[in-house]
């Protein structure tokens, strides 16, 4: 147990942020402090954990209390937000315009001119601020051969059971992805929506326990350049506090929704202790069709993106490593990443986005020191040796079955509604309307009882629902 020197809790009248010195010419960054005592959370690590990792079937669904209404821009009149607002040096916040969203979803103004005086990413993809006192954004893995793993919009909360498709979606809500990463000794930078942390804090604790890096993705997921200065402060503050309350750590990293950022937003975030993290490759996975979330991008298009990056790396065409935008948004996005990660690992070294940029202390709590990336292209998997007893039965699916989209694996089935798409490894598009694209597949099912006997490092391939298809 520890008490971070950078997190001092005192009354609301006290200074809301404590300045730290810098030697690189950047505006002094500050470590957040909070106006009332935050209880130390239980069931969470207080320093980096390199394994073995916790694999769980269920998580506590108790929500945090004392936070703003979820998915709404928080009030700017609360005493906590005002205290943070008053701590910022507004002379160092550029006067970029507060933009509006038009009926077609575009921004107004959509550009600040060809000289781009405010480094407006949504217009020019600018990643180096036009003011010298702010650092450049992190947007790539500098070293060739690295894949910076990131997921936005988590933690993926379970869907209410009275919703259509809830049972199918909830198979892939957390802890599904975090279990998968933990089993395979993989780590990601997770950009959390504060509202999702507030409603599912146990998922954030599991992610931290399993060696992932937690970052901020705002409270309500609104484009940041469309918000007032005070609204930006409120969005970031409550997200930081939610993560701190749930896990005990205070992030130094954040990502703006849609990448929408300019130097006005960057300066406010930097003065609140956060550095901007973007990307140089985008899967567009959020736009895949899902019964609950809409979307129109064929999953095969997303497959092509992954394969294109792999081919480019194999051909020596990539000048740097890549930092890739993915989401833990629904069963489609979670299945997509589970399908591709084993393939990606054959070509790239997969690490968190912050790790590939040499950041070993991503929180203001200095007891958390993450490993230095060693520059090699090897991967390590920890697995468990078990004794198993099996009973095998063979069943044949009926003709013209239905299926549910969202899983992978040539000719396999995960027990939803039958076995179809047996000629493909990806049946998302064909199954999206619940119909198979061809004759059914005969399926052999195996019931397995397992007793753990010993644990060692080995290389195994476990076929479970993470890798099966609705095929």
Go through each PLM region and give its residues.
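Cleaved targeting-peptide boundary
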Residues: 19-28, 403
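Low-complexity, Gly/Ser/Thr/Pro-rich intrinsically disordered linker/tail segments
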Residues: 320, 346-393
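Active-site beta->alpha N-cap acidic-glycine motif
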Residues: 60, 64-223, 231, 235-252
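Catalytic domains of cell-wall/extracellular-matrix polysaccharide-remodeling enzymes
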Residues: 198-202, 219-364
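N-linked glycosylation sites
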Residues: 20-22, 42, 335, 400
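Secreted, short cysteine-rich peptides and small extracellular cysteine-rich domains stabilized by multiple disulfide
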Residues: 118, 122-125, 401-441, 465-471
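Extracellular mucin-like PTS domains
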Residues: 22, 36, 378-401, 442-461
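Fungal secretory targeting signals
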Residues: 1-20, 464-471
């Amino acid at each position: 147990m520890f008490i971070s020197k950078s997190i001092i809790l005192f009354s609301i009248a006290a200074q809301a942020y404590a300045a730290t010195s810098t030697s690189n010419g950047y505006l002094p960054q500050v470590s957040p402090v909070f106006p009332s005592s935050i209880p130390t959370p239980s069931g969470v690590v207080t320093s980096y954990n390199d394994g073995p990792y916790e694999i769980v079937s269920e998580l506590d669904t108790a929500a945090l209390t004392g936070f703003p209404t979820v998915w709404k821009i928080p009030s700017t009149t609360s005493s906590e937000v005002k205290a943070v607002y008053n701590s910022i040096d507004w002379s160092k916040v550029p006067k970029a315009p507060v933009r509006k969203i038009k009926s077609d979803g575009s921004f107004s103004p959509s550009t600040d001119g060809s000289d781009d005086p405010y480094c407006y990413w949504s217009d020019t993809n600018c990643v180096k601020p036009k003011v010298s006192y702010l650092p450049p954004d992190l947007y790539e893995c500098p070293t060739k051969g690295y894949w910076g793993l990131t997921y936005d919009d988590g933690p993926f909360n379970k869907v209410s059971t009275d919703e259509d498709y809830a049972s199918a979606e909830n198979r892939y809500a957390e802890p599904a992805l975090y279990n998968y990463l933990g089993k395979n000794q993989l780590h990601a930078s997770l950009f959390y929506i504060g509202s999702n942390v507030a409603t599912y804090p146990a998922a954030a604790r599991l992610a931290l326990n399993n060696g992932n890096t937690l970052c901020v993705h705002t409270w309500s997921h609104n484009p940041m350049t469309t918000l007032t200065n005070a609204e930006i402060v409120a969005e970031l503050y409550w997200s930081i506090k939610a993560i701190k309350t749930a896990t005990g750590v205070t992030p130094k990293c954040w990502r703006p929704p849609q990448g929408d950022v300019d130097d006005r937003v960057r300066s406010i975030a930097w003065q609140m202790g956060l550095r901007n993290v973007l990307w140089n490759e985008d899967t567009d996975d959020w736009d895949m069709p899902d019964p609950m979330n809409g979307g129109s991008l064929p999953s095969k298009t997303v497959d092509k993106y992954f394969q294109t990056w792999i081919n480019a790396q194999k051909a020596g065409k990539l000048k740097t490593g890549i930092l890739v935008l993915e989401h833990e948004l629904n069963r489609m996005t979670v299945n997509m990443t589970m399908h591709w990660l084993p393939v990606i690992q054959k070509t790239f070294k997969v690490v968190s986005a912050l790790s590939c940029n040499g950041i070993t202390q991503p929180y203001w709590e200095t007891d958390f020191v993450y490993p230095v990336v060693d520059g090699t292209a090897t991967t390590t998997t920890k697995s468990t040796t078990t004794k198993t007893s099996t009973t095998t039965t063979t069943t044949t699916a009926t003709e013209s079955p239905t299926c549910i989209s969202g899983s992978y694996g040539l000719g396999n089935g995960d027990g939803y509604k039958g076995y179809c798409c047996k000629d493909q490894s990806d049946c998302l598009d064909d199954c999206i309307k619940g119909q198979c694209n061809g004759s059914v597949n005969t399926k052999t099912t195996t019931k397995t009882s397992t007793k753990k006997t010993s644990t060692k490092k080995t290389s195994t391939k476990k076929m479970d629902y993470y890798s099966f298809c609705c095929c």
